[in-house]
Swiss-Prot record:
SUPFAM superfamilies assigned to the protein according to its UniProt record, in alphabetical order: Enolase C-terminal domain-like (SSF51604), Enolase N-terminal domain-like (SSF54826)
Active site (catalytic residues): 206 (proton donor), 336 (proton acceptor)
Binding residues annotated for Mg(2+), in chain numbering: 243, 284, 311
One Gene Ontology molecular-function label: magnesium ion binding
Gene name of the record: eno
Keyword Transmembrane among record annotations: no
Protein name per Swiss-Prot or TrEMBL: Enolase
Family matches, as Pfam families: Enolase_C (PF00113), Enolase_N (PF03952)
Organism field: Synechococcus sp. (strain JA-3-3Ab) (Cyanobacteria bacterium Yellowstone A-Prime)
Gene Ontology CC, one term: extracellular region
Keywords associated with the record: Cytoplasm, Glycolysis, Lyase, Magnesium, Metal-binding, Secreted
Pathway given in the UniProt record: Carbohydrate degradation; glycolysis; pyruvate from D-glyceraldehyde 3-phosphate: step 4/5
The protein's role, per its UniProt record: Catalyzes the reversible conversion of 2-phosphoglycerate (2-PG) into phosphoenolpyruvate (PEP). It is essential for the degradation of carbohydrates via glycolysis.
Length: 432
């Protein structure tokens, strides 16, 4: 069998934060290979699949991944040798069964995911297809709207902003290439505005600027100014999006935000004010991962006006997503491959979301590599949205460049999601 897995190798490498992660290389009988590298998050949900670390304080502060590498070279390779790489579902089920734990803690979700993705890449190579086409079939032609994280706060930066990500979304662009240009020009304008005001232009983990500001609203004002200075119309050409990462704010049942302890209802009141004043079309993790009652109330109040994205709430887990669907919590899900740990489970979660009318956003992690799989996955699944950081740092730009290549390859068949990818909304213009 030409597409049988013949060998698997793995290496400990570094991610964009200088922390260890791993890569796996899968080789098939016909000579095709697939290389995959896995990311790591900073603000992680409690219910994510387990990332296996060595725990040896003498190496990388205990964060080495040599045990995960050994699991790939040993039991995983033994289990998969001779299996057909074209049967992704079987490969992933074998990995899940071999691990035998609910959260992949025996072999490590990082080890399992690296092999799962590398297998898919090897299979795509074996049949002579680009990854997005191999995974998505003939109708994979939708380029996602990028949610570009240009101002960083929270766990992604050393500053005084509580909200973790302030994003721009080029909804009015006619193509992905133009969307990327819109974003790059706003990013350049934002840097100029920060310099003019004597503010820091140092960047956070995801490439966004990380200045100290008077308030979270001041960060939004900066974005509005930068959009206008770049020659674009807020709410028409470029909209805004936020990732609050509210788990990081929760202490003793209350949200500690801008120096005050707030209830879930008070947080929702705050978001409602922001929606009235700014063209915000997406709000991620506005409340904590176990605040189901708060999420239900927030969705009832705001869900018709804004995309409410569950990241820590759902952790790409179909069981948690089903709970959200059944209880009316959120209306969109962030998809992170390493939260669940295999390609098959990731795609199954996306399918469940789509069937329930939830929107899907394919996402990077704060600790990234040069791997571009999520760009192909976004096109393959017709997700319509992607989060892969700012307009600097090569591990972020790599994904954008891959999307440019895909769009060029698709030619006239390419469709840019734009505003439609985030749903038709009457976004308010600046009303302050």
């Amino acid at each position: 069998m030409e597409t049988a897995i013949e060998w698997i190798t793995a290496h400990e490498i570094l991610d964009s934060r200088g922390q260890p992660t791993l890569e796996a290389l899968v080789g098939l009988a016909n000579g095709a290979t697939g290389l995959a590298q896995v990311p790591s998050g900073a603000s992680t949900g409690t219910f994510e699949a387990h990332e296996l670390r060595d725990g040896d304080p003498k190496r990388y502060g205990g964060k080495g991944v040599l045990r995960a590498v050994e699991n790939i070279l040993g039991p995983i390779q033994s289990e998969l040798r001779g299996e057909d790489a074209l049967n992704q579902a079987r490969i992933d089920q074998l990995l899940i069964d071999l691990d035998g734990t609910p959260n992949k803690s025996q072999l490590g979700a990082n080890a399992i995911l690296a092999v799962s993705l590398a297998t898919a890449k090897a299979a795509a190579s074996a049949v002579g297809l680009p990854l997005y086409r191999y995974l998505g079939g003939p109708f994979a032609n939708l380029l996602p709207a990028p949610l570009m994280n240009v101002l960083n706060g929270g766990a992604h930066a050393d500053n005084n902003l509580d909200i973790q990500e302030f994003m721009i979304v080029p909804i009015g662009a006619p193509s992905f290439r133009e969307a990327l240009r819109y974003g790059a020009e706003v990013f350049a304008a934002l840097k100029q505005v920060l310099r003019q005001r004597g503010l820091s232009t140092g960047v956070g983990d995801e490439g966004g600027f990380a200045p100290n500001l008077d308030s979270n609203a001041a960060a939004l004002d900066l974005l509005m100014t930068a959009i206008e200075q770049a020659g674009y119309r807020p709410g028409e050409d470029i909209a805004l999006a936020l990732d609050v990462a509210a788990n990081e704010l929760l202490q003793d049942g209350q949200y500690h935000f801008e120096g005050k302890a707030r209830s879930a209802e008070q947080m929702v009141n705050y978001y409602e004010q922001l929606l009235a004043n700014y063209p915000i079309l997406s709000l991620e993790d506005g409340l904590a991962e176990e605040d189901w009652a708060g999420w239900q109330a927030m969705t009832a109040r705001l869900g018709s006006r804004v995309q409410l994205v569950g990241d820590d709430l759902f952790v790409t887990n179909p069981a948690r997503l089903q709970k959200g669907i059944d209880s009316g919590a959120a209306n969109a899900i962030l998809i992170k491959l390493n939260q669940i740990g295999t390609l098959t489970e990731t795609v199954s979660t996306i399918q469940l979301a789509v069937q329930a009318g939830f929107r899907t956003l394919i996402s990077h992690r704060s600790g990234e590599t040069e791997d571009t799989t999520i760009a192909d996955l976004a096109v393959a699944t017709r997700a319509g949205q992607i989060k892969t950081g700012s307009l600097c740092r090569s591990e972020r730009i790599a994904k954008y460049n891959q999307l440019l290549r895909i769009e060029d390859e698709l030619g006239e068949a390419a469709v840019y999601a734009g505003r439609v990818g985030l749903g038709p909304r009457g976004l308010p213009a600046r009303s302050r």
